[in-house]
A protein has these predicted regions:
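Short beta-strand scaffold segments in enzyme catalytic cores
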Residues: 91-95
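Structural signature of cysteine-dependent C-C bond-forming condensing enzymes
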Residues: 2-21, 29-86, 97-100
């Protein structure tokens, strides 16, 4: 996933994972992450911080991990992407943002 993000998005796009804060909720994971995205857009632009051990994998591209208190850039049309990859190849990328 990090390789795809590094190829598709510009350098410096904020990245995070909510699973360390919620646990492995299986079928509810996508709904929870969508709720985090919606909250970021509607309550002060605060992004969910990336909680991790700080040990980057040198085989993967460096990404800009969201830090506590970091906010979404104020742009004319804000949007967030939530990726959900599940058992059996059930995958989805949900884009949530301001109406045009």
């Amino acid at each position: 996933e990090s390789q795809a993000v590094a190829r598709v998005f510009p350098d410096g796009v904020p990245c995070s994972s909510t699973k360390p804060m919620t646990g492995h909720t299986l079928g509810a994971a996508g709904a929870l992450e969508a709720a985090f995205c919606w909250l970021s857009l509607t309550h002060g632009n605060t992004l969910a911080p990336h909680v991790w051990d700080g040990q980057a994998d040198p085989a993967l591209p460096a990404l800009r991990w969201v830090t506590p208190g970091q906010t979404l850039a104020l742009t004319p049309q804000r949007c967030l992407m939530s990726n959900s990859f599940a058992f059996g190849g059930n995958n989805v990328s949900l884009i949530i943002g301001d109406a045009p």
